[in-house]
């Protein structure tokens, strides 16, 4: 089962329910009919395919006209644990409104000379913390349930990325030779990263790999062999928050140039099967079909899972593709 959407849409308000997507994916957009000289939206698509588990624990949002006409928000969230689907859904539903409210506060309070990207960065740090705090107040148990989160905001030529966990943002950009290449904009924040493992151990958490998966380090409680979390930063997972797992995002900024063609956000259901270069090349070789780009990547990842694991396991797969140059032309 999969859900795939493309923008533009006709909705302009932020909602915290599911009216814009059947469960796992929501898309928002605006149709302004503005003057030809005003900025126009970038085009994007999003697709989520359920794996072999009972529930698809991935959620995603693609928001066009996010606060201002020239701003887009993308986010993918990969839940884990018993209630991971509820964690990722709650984060997906709440984060856009919380983040935008914080940004608008900064617009009113901050120095007029402060760059927009810097204000988005500050808003992301605070929003992630507040959302994690809200999760701790939910009726569903988040002790050993949580979610990754990678969020991208584009405003004009500014790109801000905030990341928790092992979902990933990758840029497709042109080389001097006219070839497309992949540039990874996020780090996979897992216990395999020495600095992440060190923080966890300093907080009395344990980091080691299971015998059945010797190449994958996991996080464990000090005196119990649970839960074996495969990431070092996440929303939720509150039993591990005293032991080094944090909800502090790693944030980066990028200035979009004419060489930058598209941005891909995806959960590890994609990256566990396809390399950055494979994903970028697939989109580019397809003729940059904006409306179907995310679906194309998701289906390629699904096929790779089925081929490699003989249909015994397929992870949930969620992809957003935002094209940075080819924009919607006003009517």
UniProtKB/Swiss-Prot annotation:
Coiled coil: none
Keyword Aminoacyl-tRNA synthetase: no
Protein's UniProt keywords contain Cytoplasm: no
One Pfam family, short name: PP2C
Residues reported to bind Mn(2+) 2: 78, 268, 315
Cofactor binding, note field: Binds 2 magnesium or manganese ions per subunit.
Reaction catalysis annotation: O-phospho-L-seryl-[protein] + H2O = L-seryl-[protein] + phosphate; O-phospho-L-threonyl-[protein] + H2O = L-threonyl-[protein] + phosphate
Cofactors that this protein relies on: Mg(2+); Mn(2+)
GO terms, molecular function: metal ion binding; protein serine/threonine phosphatase activity
SMART domains: PP2Cc
InterPro entries, sorted: PP2C (IPR015655), PPM-type-like_dom_sf (IPR036457), PPM-type_phosphatase-like_dom (IPR001932)
Positions with a binding annotation for Mn(2+) 1: 78-79
Keywords attached to this entry: Hydrolase, Magnesium, Manganese, Metal-binding, Protein phosphatase
Signal peptide, first to last residue: none
Domain PPM-type phosphatase per the UniProt entry, residue ranges: 43-324
EC nos: 3.1.3.16
Family: Belongs to the PP2C family.
This protein's name: Probable protein phosphatase 2C 72
């Amino acid at each position: 089962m999969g859900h795939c959407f493309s923008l533009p849409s006709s909705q302009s308000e932020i909602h915290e329910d599911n009216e814009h997507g059947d469960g796992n994916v929501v898309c928002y957009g605006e149709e302004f009919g503005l003057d030809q000289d005003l900025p126009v939206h970038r085009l994007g698509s999003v697709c989520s395919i359920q794996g072999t588990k009972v529930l698809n624990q991935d959620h995603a949002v693609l928001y066009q006209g996010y606060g201002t006409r020239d701003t887009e928000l993308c986010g993918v969230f990969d839940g884990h644990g018993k209630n991971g689907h509820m964690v990722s859904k709650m984060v997906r539903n709440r984060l856009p409104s919380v983040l935008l409210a914080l940004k608008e506060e900064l617009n009113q309070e901050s120095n007029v000379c402060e760059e927009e990207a810097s204000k988005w960065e500050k808003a992301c740090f605070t929003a992630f913390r507040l959302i994690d705090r809200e999760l701790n107040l939910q009726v569903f148990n988040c002790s050993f349930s949580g979610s990754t989160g990678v969020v991208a905001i584009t405003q004009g030529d500014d790109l801000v990325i905030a990341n928790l966990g092992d979902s990933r943002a990758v840029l497709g950009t042109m080389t001097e030779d006219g070839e497309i290449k992949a540039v990874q904009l996020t780090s996979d924040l897992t216990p395999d990263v020495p600095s992440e493992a060190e923080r966890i151990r300093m907080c009395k958490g344990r980091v080691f790999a299971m015998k059945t998966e010797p190449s994958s380090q996991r996080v464990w409680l000090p005196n119990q062999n649970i839960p074996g979390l495969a990431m070092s930063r996440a929303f939720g997972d509150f039993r591990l928050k005293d032991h080094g797992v944090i909800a502090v995002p790693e944030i980066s900024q990028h200035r979009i140039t004419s060489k930058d063609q598209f941005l891909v956000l995806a959960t590890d259901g994609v990256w566990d099967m396809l390399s950055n270069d494979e994903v970028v090349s697939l989109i580019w070789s397809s003729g940059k079909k904006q409306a179907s780009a995310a679906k194309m990547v998701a289906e390629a990842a699904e096929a790779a899972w089925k081929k490699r694991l003989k249909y015994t396991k397929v992870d949930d797969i969620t992809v957003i593709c935002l094209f940075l140059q080819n924009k919607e032309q006003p009517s």
